[in-house]
From Swiss-Prot:
Keywords: Chaperone, Cytoplasm, DNA replication, Metal-binding, Repeat, Stress response, Zinc, Zinc-finger. One of its GO terms (biological process) is response to heat. Disulfide bonds: none annotated. Zn(2+) 1 binds at residues 145, 148, 198, 201. The J domain is necessary and sufficient to stimulate DnaK ATPase activity. Zinc center 1 plays an important role in the autonomous, DnaK-independent chaperone activity of DnaJ. Zinc center 2 is essential for interaction with DnaK and for DnaJ activity. This is Chaperone protein DnaJ. CXXCXGXG motif repeats lie at residues 145-152, 162-169, 184-191, 198-205. It is found in: Cytoplasm. Binds 2 Zn(2+) ions per monomer. GO terms for cellular component: cytoplasm. Belongs to the DnaJ family. Participates actively in the response to hyperosmotic and heat shock by preventing the aggregation of stress-denatured proteins and by disaggregating proteins, also in an autonomous, DnaK-independent fashion. Unfolded proteins bind initially to DnaJ; upon interaction with the DnaJ-bound protein, DnaK hydrolyzes its bound ATP, resulting in the formation of a stable complex. GrpE releases ADP from DnaK; ATP binding to DnaK triggers the release of the substrate protein, thus completing the reaction cycle. It comes from Aggregatibacter actinomycetemcomitans. CDD domains: DnaJ, DnaJ_C, DnaJ_zf.
Length: 375
């Protein structure tokens, strides 16, 4: 039976680089490894073919020969080893694979575990969100121990490499091609053997501390935005880099404005006489009061847009708009004289539908509705 093309077998293109070849092999090896397929002969053969393909394509010389001559390059008498595939270090492949799972992949390297990232939720006003501000915050985190300066050992105490894991902080166990890893229980994963642990941090090298920070919040932020403060998270183990602090923004509700992205909305009440006769009013913006001209015969719900009076976008740098929705207020607590004036106004408008456009439109619609019912 003809052999399957090595590139097709690994599911990669002929231009695949070393990393792509290794990634494809890892994925397939995990799927077809005998320890997982539990005696399935067909999958066991498939695993052998995958190993064979990997050794050829991962070797520059063998790959070049395969690209030129195909499988014939490795037949007896061709000078390329007669089809023997025993040279690849598959322990390294599986070691890397499980090293990723357990926090590191190299042999003999001390484990480097970056510190945890932290989250801090902060509440600001709309004005602060629009214009930017600086806030002082206090967080509780793991910081390097001041007593031992992060070493975990008392002054003058010996710190040696763990003789069991040789400083890696992990112990490996290999059965055939299958490799497992677990933290070294002799040094508790630190890779070190400390003669006298620091009494302050008990050998960890880190202690819980309160830390004060000043956070600069840029103009234009909105609820849900995150600010990353690099290196302000928890300290890492064994002198590893600290994690980051993520400050999550929450903008308080405003008593006047509603926000939608870069745009602002507000409701502006006016008297019914101004709505009828027109006039000029002052409306609030985040930059102060501005004048708005109300035309005659303005109805409730009419929208006025004030360009550039919204929020400046952090991405585009352009300011949004402020949209004002007019609310015509009905007067309350009228005296008899005022009520009489309104009655006279109502009488004077009786039958003049052109002066009451909304009422006219509504009544016409009602009439058509009932006319349709009686047909």
């Amino acid at each position: 039976m003809a052999k399957q093309d090595y590139y097709e077998l690994l599911g990669i293109s002929r231009s695949a680089d070393e990393k792509e070849i290794k990634r494809a092999y890892k994925k397939l090896a995990m799927q077809y490894h005998p320890d997982r397929t539990k005696g399935d002969k067909e999958k066991e053969e498939k695993f052998k073919e995958i190993q064979e393909a990997y050794e050829v394509l991962n070797d520059k010389e063998k790959r070049a020969a395969y690209d030129q001559y195909g499988h014939a390059a490795f037949e007896q008498g061709t000078g390329f080893g007669g089809g023997s595939f025993g040279g690849a270090d598959f322990g390294d492949i599986f070691g890397d694979m499980f090293g990723d799972i357990f926090g590191g992949g190299g042999r003999g390297r001390q484990r480097v575990v970056r510190g945890d990232d932290l989250r801090y939720d902060i509440e600001i006003t709309l004005e602060e969100a629009v214009k930017g501000t600086t806030k002082d915050i206090k967080i509780h985190t793991l910081a390097p121990c001041d007593t031992c300066h992060g070493t975990g050992a008392e002054a003058g105490s010996k710190v040696e490499t763990c003789p069991h894991c040789h400083g890696a902080g992990r112990l490996r166990r290999q059965q055939g091609f299958f490799v497992t890893e677990q933290p070294c229980h002799f040094c508790h994963g630190t890779g070190k053997k400390i003669e006298k642990p620091c009494k302050t941090c008990h050998g960890d090298g880190r202690v819980n501390k309160a830390k004060n920070l000043s956070v600069k919040i840029p103009a234009g932020v909105d609820t849900g935005n995150q600010l990353r403060l690099s290196g302000e998270g928890a300290a890492g183990e064994n002198g590893a880099p600290a994690g980051d602090l993520y400050v999550v923004i929450h903008v308080k509700e405003h008593h006047i404005f509603e926000r939608d992205g870069s745009n602002l909305y507000c409701e502006v009440p006016i008297s019914f006489t101004m709505a009828a006769l027109g006039g000029e009013i002052e409306v609030p913006t985040l930059d102060g009061r501005v004048k708005l001209k109300i035309p005659e015969e303005t109805q409730t719900g009419k929208l006025f847009r004030m360009r550039g009076k919204g929020v400046t976008s952090t991405r585009s740098g352009y300011a949004g708009d402020l949209t004002c929705r007019i609310i015509v207020e009905t007067p309350v607590k009228l005296n008899e004289e005022q009520k009489e004036l309104l009655r006279k106004l109502e009488e004077s408008l009786e039958g003049q539908t052109k002066q009451r456009p909304k009422s006219s439109s509504f009544l016409d619609g009602v009439k058509r509705f009932f006319d349709d019912l009686t047909k």
